Each structure stands twice: as structure tokens, then as C-alpha cells.
Amino acid sequence: MAANKPGKEAILAAFFDEGSYSPLFTDGAVSAAFGCANGQSVYAVYQNGEPVGAADLDKTTRVLKMAAETGNPVVTFYNSTGAKLEGGLELLNANSRLTAEIARISGVVPQVAVVTGTCAGTSAVQAAAADVCIMAADAELFLTAPFNAEDKVKAAGSAEFAAKAGVAAIVEEDAVKAASAAARVVGMLPANNLAGPAVFDFEAPAAALNLVKYDAKSAAEAIADAGSLTELYAGYGRNIYTALGSVNGQAVGIVATAKGTLCHKCTAKAARFVRLCDAYSIPVVTVVNTEGFVKSEGDDQAGGIRQAARMAGVYAEATTVKVAILAGEAVGPIYTVFAASADWRIAVDGCTVAPLAPETAATVLYKDEIFASDNIQQATKQKAAAYKAEQCSAVVAVANGAADAAVKAADVRAAAAQALDMLATKRTTRLPKKHGNITL
């Protein structure tokens, strides 16, 4: 380990509450501890940078089983130069058991991966399978060593690359700050899938929702408690903002669209985040204001349609509390995907809720009048504006069942908080089946 790299004691001290943790296993390349992080009981597995053997992997598997049995989160700190090759097939078997256990307890207790050094091969798969993957800026994460890859890509294997690929949810300056971020995330999540959501002291945000100067992050900040937001996947799908936070002290997940168009990365990001929230019954508040899906054959080829279908399926399948805030453009498939399956839909004065964009609808409905005009462009704008005012407003959306409440922008936070309180005891059942077959 380089002299300027933080060691085990510094990293665990940043993760656990002061004086709260006790070691469980101390020998070998992997050690473990149990304590409290941000007030939450949690297990930690720590790789010390040495090659891991079968016994080290089985030790990790045992901690995961203990976490599931006791209903507590588990955080794994990844930093290993590889595997002890003399372990042979027993090493392969131990790695297989660990990978299977990670999948088995997924959705039972939160799993957080913190990559502080090198995380390669099967370990990279295991880290990416966690609910949240956090990396130090100087850490490495890769399946195949970048210098062995046939197609050389700039910054491959780096934390920056992992963030752009949608693998790393958070990237911090160093391992100590990454550990602190992990403690923050663990504190936002419930202990397990049967525990209630976390509750916090709170202060109201400084500013209300502003539709004129709308941007995704500001919209989320206007709804969440002051200083409560922890953004996930900031480097991926930048036209959607996803963050864990709280509203009136209750933990929530917030999804907010930017006003631009949504590509396949944006929809994949939202689907991943909503699925995390649903696994642990964290309410989801979605702020909708976007021009729609990106018009691009290239994006379709990259999975645009498939990822949009995936996101629609994740939202529809989620049984957690879902509140949609229609804060601007919510037209056609955007409304269908983000708002149709919500338990409560709040339309903000000035929003546009419609099956088609007003300009498109006007050219169809008023075709003869528009073409009879001396100025087709101006006539189209006038008819579109009239159609928007008469057919697409918040009040009309409520009257026609496309929304449940119409509010002013200044009252959005209060309306969202009221909806969350009203729906807090929501119970729902699913049809008996093995699992759905949404696109992945």
C-alpha cells in the first residue's frame, strides 16, 4: 500500500460511528467487523489489498449469511491484487458460492460495495451486483485489465469510467470519503426489507419549486428536506436526477427529469434507482418535466426502446408508494411511463398533460383552418396555444382523471408530503407468478 493511501483503521473509523464497532475476523486477506454507521447496525467486510484465497471468500459469504439472518446491511470494502492462484478449483468454488450468496440476499438486506483499491474479474461482478457501488477516485474496477483489452478505451478501469458506465453510483476523492459516503447511504436505507423507512430530523428547503427556472436538481431540492439529498449515478444519464433524501423527515427516493430529452442511459438509470427503492419499500417521488425521449435511431439501436420499456415495467411493478409530480411537459409515453402507475399524481399549475404534443394535436384537429390561413406557422402556434390552454392544463388533467390534485408551484412540497403521509400504510399484493419478464 502506498504511503499516502489511507489504511484500514482510517477507513473503518470514517465508516463506523466512533467507538461502535468490534472485529469479527482478523486473520487473512479479509477481515470483518460489526458496529453502527450513521446510527444503523451494519456488518463490514474489508479486503486489505492482498490476494484472496478460498478461506477469505468463504469468510465473506459467512458474513453475508449472518447479515441476512440478523436483518442488517452489509458493506464490503474491495481492495485486492487478485486471487491466490494456488487455490485452484476450490478458489473457483468459493467465488461461486459468494456470487450466489450476493444474489440470494439481494433485496433482503442492503448491500453496499466500496471500492478503495483494485477490484478485478469476479470481484468486479460482485461489487457491481451490490445495491449501491461507491468508489474512491483512485480505485480500479474492471473485468479485463485495460492493458489486455483488444479495444483500448481512455480511462478504462478507472472510477471516472465506472461512473460514466453507470456502475459506480458515487465517486469520492479518496477511500476515507468513500467510506463516509457509504455510512451516509446505509443511514438512508432501512435495515432490511421488512423494516420501516428511516426517519430523520428535518428543516424545510430554502426555495420552492420554480417552473420558469426549472432544472432537475433544483426541483428535487425544492421537495426534499434541506441538505438531505445524496445523489446517485451523477455521472450517468445526466438528464435524469436520482437521489436518496427525506421529505418531512421520512426517507424517500427522488427521480427528477431535466427539461431536455431522455436517452437510453437516463431510462436505465431511473429503472435501476426505482428498483432499489422498491426492494426496500422506500417511497418514490417522481418530478416530470421533459421534452420526451430522444429522437435518435442511434439511441434506439443502443437500447432506447428496450430501456424505456424496462423503466415502464419497473415503475408499474413497484409496490412501494409512488407519487408523481407533473411539473411541466408530461406528454404521451412520458406520462404513461412516469405517472400512469403512481398512487397519487399532483399536477402543477402551468404543466402540460396530453396524449400528444399540443403542436402535433393542433395540426391534426385544426388542419383545414390552419391551411386556410394566410400564415400557416402563426396559425399553428395560435391553435396549439388554444389547445394547450383548453385541453392540457392541470385543472383539465384532474377533471379527466389524469391527475389527482392541482396545486400551485409554491405548494408542491406540502402536497407531496401530504400524499406520502396518506399513503404511508399502503398495502398491495401481486398476482401469483415466478417473476415478470420485463426487458433487462
Report the location of each language-model feature.
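Ligand-binding clefts of soluble mixed alpha/beta catalytic domains
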Residues: 1-440
